[in-house]
């Protein structure tokens, strides 16, 4: 299992890890029963940072696209904000709009439906922030609670301990690279300023070349197990 360090300067970080394809499938199966399912699927299939996912709003998610346009516009997610101090994404180039794979569209539709069904139960306590991922009363998710729920999923998947939500981003890079996506395209999908960042931080997960994002993720996850 590849291990690499992704930590702010001057701080000691836990080595990040990447899921294998078999582990990814086990994770997705286990996540299906979790309220965090759409969070896991979106993070894994788009590479969105965990601090970006926690503040993602529904008005930045297009689950329909424009299939009749010329050329057709696929369903997409616009990543413009982050839970970082100041609310901005990590860098200006971190602002990006990424196509959504079919598995992410399905998970988000189901999540949106459940959220709409559960909202009346909160009654007057509901706070409408328009968040895709929120508490039972509409408030932003706490990072510690996300980590706790995610670890329940990895344990249910038989993956053991020590995993964190940010490992989903490493898995995204690994799956994209294994699918033949060039490092330049992976850097753009991941919201990196330059390929050097991708190559440094995710160096053990990168492989040589060819193709693009949502289509590759659909092909990888839809392919039969060996």
Residue positions per predicted region:
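Short, basic (Lys/Arg/His-rich) helix/loop patches that form interaction surfaces
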Residues: 25-37, 46, 98, 114-124, ...
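Extracytoplasmic/cell-surface-exposed regions of Actinobacterial cell-envelope-associated
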Residues: 42-43, 47-48, 53, 58, ...
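Structural detector for helix-capping/boundary residues
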Residues: 22, 56-59, 144, 171, ...
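C-terminal secondary-structure termini that scaffold catalytic or DNA-interacting sites
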Residues: 4-7, 18, 63-69, 73-76, ...
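A short, basic/aromatic helix-end/turn motif that makes direct DNA contacts
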Residues: 55-61, 187-193, 203
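Basic, Lys/Arg- and aromatic-enriched nucleic-acid-binding interface segment
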Residues: 1-56, 71-73, 94, 103, ...
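Alpha-solenoid repeat scaffolds
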Residues: 34, 208-209
């Amino acid at each position: 299992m590849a291990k690499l360090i992704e930590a702010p300067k001057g701080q000691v970080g836990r080595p990040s890890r990447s899921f294998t394809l078999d582990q990814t499938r086990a994770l997705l199966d286990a996540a299906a029963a979790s309220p965090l399912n759409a969070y896991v699927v979106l993070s894994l299939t788009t590479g969105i940072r965990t601090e970006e996912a926690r503040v993602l709003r529904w008005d930045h998610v297009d689950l329909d696209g424009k299939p009749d346009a010329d050329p057709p516009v696929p369903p997409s997610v616009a990543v413009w904000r982050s839970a970082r101090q100041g609310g901005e994404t990590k860098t200006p180039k971190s602002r990006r709009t990424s196509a959504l794979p079919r598995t992410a569209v399905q998970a988000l539709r189901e999540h949106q439906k459940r959220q709409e069904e559960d909202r009346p139960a909160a009654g007057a306590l509901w706070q409408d922030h328009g968040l895709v991922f929120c508490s039972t009363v509409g408030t932003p998710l706490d990072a510690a609670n996300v980590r706790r729920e995610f670890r329940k999923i990895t344990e249910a998947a038989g993956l053991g301990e020590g995993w964190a939500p940010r490992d989903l981003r490493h898995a995204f890079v690994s799956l994209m690279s294994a699918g033949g996506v060039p490092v330049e395209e992976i850097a753009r999908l991941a919201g990196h300023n330059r390929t050097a960042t991708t190559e440094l931080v995710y160096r053990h997960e990168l492989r040589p070349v060819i193709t693009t994002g949502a289509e590759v993720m659909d092909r990888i996850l839809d392919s039969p197990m060996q």
